[in-house]
Amino acid sequence: MNSICQPSQLPHGAYAFDQFKTEDFREAFRLAIEEKRREVEAIIASPEAPTFANTILALERSGALLEWVSGSFYNLLHAEATDELMQISQEVSPSLSALSSFITLSEPLFERIRQVWEARESLQLDAEDLRLLERCYEGFSESGAQLPAEEKERLREVKRELSELSLTFGQNNLKDQQRFRLFVDDAAAVEGLPLSTLAVARELAEKEGKGEGWLFTLSAPSYFPFMQHCPSSTLRQEMYLAKMAVGAAGDAYDNRELIRRLVNLRLELAQLLGSKSFAEKVLTRRMAGSTTAVYGLLDELLEAYKPLAEKELAAVADFAREAGATLPLQPWDWSYWAERYKQAFYELDEEELRPYFELSRVSDAIFSLATRLYGIRFTECTDLPVYHSDVHTYEVHDADGSYLGLLYTDFFPREGKQSGAWMNNLQEQYHTAEGEDHRPHIVLVMNFTQPTADRPALLTPGEVRTFLHEFGHSLHGMLSTCRHGSLSGTNVVRDFVELPSQLMENWLDEREWLQSFAVHYQTGEALPEVLMERMERARHFLAGYAACRQLSFGYLDMAWHTITEPLAEGLDTKTFEDTAWQKAQLLPATPAPCQMSTSFGHIFSGGYAAGYYGYKWAEVLDADAFAAFQEEGIFSTATAERFRREVLSQGDRRDAEELYQSFRGKKATIDALLRRDGIER
């Protein structure tokens, strides 16, 4: 029997990763796609009059095997990719796209849905069932089910091409980034780099037979410390240009023409469905609602932050000039001199803080924070199979002892693992046909600095913040109480989904929480008062620059997705990018072919197309939401319970704005965010 499709015999229905055979995914997808199609065909062919149960609910519950296969496959594809997995993903992409089009473009299926929708007032549905019906009807009515046959066929082809191109973009990024190596054998050139970074680089050099020296890569734990601490501007330039040329090297992994095709196809899809631009189509179902609202927020924040950012840039540049640097500072010089400035004026070196943030203690502290706020508890299980030896598994239970779900953690970079950090649902939360509450299985994936032979994994405060962020997403999934999987957990509009994650980041800035766990991994000494004071003084360091950087990404995303005419062949993506984000840029432009767009996975392969602004949108929400904790106590269980009840448990049961105001009692404004970043209006 197929190793992927076998029903789980493990506790909680966990995946038997140790039994999976990669080659079995081909057949597993074939079987799962066929099963889903048969289930949908049965709904369409039903001789019974359409009802909520035989149409909407039946459609919601269809495809269980496909959900099972996809949940494991796409996690492995991102966290443990092999050439065979990537090949399989390319092979199954057209079949998945065809299945999606078969469903969403089916006129008889849409007709059944429409009849149920029009009868909704007489059906006596509860609020969640009505929400499912609403989402189902909206989704089909906006997906082209009523288009003429010729336009439907074109829409099928567009969706198929988009699926394949998005997949190729991500795989090009992974392969291009992972092939780069920078070997350094001059000790003076790496003087000042963190010992942990050097130890990993030394081990990699030995592993790859480079001899005495250090081997650096573009993975975050290697790249960012290198850019902050390498004293050689020449080597920093080499590293930076390599990073910014990912997907733009003019070879098999070049993404430039692929970007043009992607955005043109997205435009065509939107216009087939009646919108002027892809952004217009996407934003009608977001909190923002329109491109006008998105640009309004971006412009309002830019007006508030850019003057501060320009002052920050001038201060760092003056400091660098006095230290002998050549002005203007180039992009590859910025991180290095900003770090020197922080050390000089705030007496704060993030590497000095690493020993106080040993990963296992940080993990325990974050779990304990969730216990303190929400009453939930984490118990490690060592008897469940995992897909890599780095992965740990935890059972999560509520305060009353009831089971909430499984949490997998995967912390370290390795070959075949994408860069960055993310949370995935391996299995969604939902109620089965028998009424059983199927609890979620969630994975947190990071790329933290690895342990070495003589040191455990030690984190910077920035890495702790990343952990908190992704853990916030996991809480959103873990605490869901929905009956319908498509509404549960993180299945909310994109500009709301970052609220729970970004809210969790706030506790890193709270002394009371830091004091509960931050001790030196060797001596047990508590994080010294002087270091906490320095962290607090530096809290707003480069707040303006960081905000403008994020805003520039938002402008770039919107520029790609507000086009109303196709982009011509031969498009210079570098020039397009430079124009799109110019007003939010502070440093000199990088030389061609270097650019952000060709590796901008969030918008070209990660689901954030016309949605990157959502990080700033949610930042406004999270600052305003955390103000409630500050008003009532940062460990207030009453406030936490209200957030759990009104936001974390709700999924997409109600509109995001309604959920937020149910928690906060008012609309959010940017005032709390500006105060948090030290800006008074």
Segments the model singles out, each with a brief description of its role:
Residues 9-24, 73-92, 115-157, 217-257, ...:
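Short His/Asp/Glu-rich catalytic/ion-coordination signatures at enzyme active sites or charged loops
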Residues 128, 132-133, 161-164, 171, ...:
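Active-site-proximal, well-structured secondary-structure segments within enzyme catalytic domains
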